[in-house]
């Protein structure tokens, strides 16, 4: 429903609202402290984060969300600035279209990470989660020929690490770290695979 859509759009809108038409990064390449704090408050990170939540290099939930926004094509980083993409500007005022645009870019990563993300989406859509999901993804990746650098089968922890950017994006859309709604994660995974209209 619309409540789910608004919740799923919340983290991405928080980043887009903070960045506005574009912002200059610090000399070290981070978001300015005021914007980090704004994003942390808008996404609920400040409810559980220990510390000020105003430096991106020390506030990993905000840093990861910004990186995810770049990976799913909402932000573009170039020449010391970060700006919303044309796609982001087109959907920013429309939560459903924004969520659909993000889901269309899942899974995230390259190589085995993308495959881990795909199989994690399939598992989540089928209602799997946690250790069961990680073990299943590891087995599928191993069956498909992926190996560690040492040549051994992939572990559940390695499969989870590969799928993590995709899993984290879904968790942030389903209420965030401390308030994740597992049923919404399942619905979002299905929407990522089959389209938002098929599951909303």
Feature locations, PLM:
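Short, amphipathic alpha-helical interface elements at domain boundaries
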Residues: 1-58
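Accessory beta->alpha helical hairpin/"wing" motif in late/C-terminal subdomains of nucleic-acid enzymes
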Residues: 63-67, 76-109, 157-161, 174-200
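Elongated scaffolding segments in large macromolecular assemblies
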Residues: 122-200
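Leucine-rich, amphipathic alpha-helical/linker segments
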Residues: 1-19, 95-143, 200
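Charged, alpha-helical interface segments at or near domain boundaries
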Residues: 52, 60, 64-72
């Amino acid at each position: 429903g619309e409540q789910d859509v608004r919740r799923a759009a919340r983290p991405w809108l928080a980043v887009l609202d903070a960045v506005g038409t574009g912002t200059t990064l610090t000399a070290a390449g981070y978001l300015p402290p005021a914007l980090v704090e704004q994003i942390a408050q808008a996404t609920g990170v400040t409810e559980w984060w220990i510390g000020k939540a105003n430096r991106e290099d020390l506030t990993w939930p905000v840093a990861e969300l910004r990186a995810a926004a770049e990976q799913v094509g909402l932000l573009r980083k170039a020449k010391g600035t970060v700006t919303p993409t044309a796609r982001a500007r087109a959907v920013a005022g429309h939560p459903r279209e924004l969520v659909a645009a993000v889901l269309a870019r899942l899974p995230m990563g390259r190589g085995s990470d993308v495959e881990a993300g795909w199989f994690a989406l399939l598992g989540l859509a089928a209602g799997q989660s946690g250790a069961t999901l990680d073990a299943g993804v590891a087995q599928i990746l191993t069956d498909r020929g992926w190996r560690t650098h040492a040549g051994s089968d992939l572990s559940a922890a390695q499969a989870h690490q590969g799928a993590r950017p995709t899993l984290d994006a879904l968790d942030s859309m389903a209420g965030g770290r401390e308030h994740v709604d597992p049923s919404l994660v399942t619905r979002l995974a299905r929407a990522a695979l089959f389209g938002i209209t098929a599951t909303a």
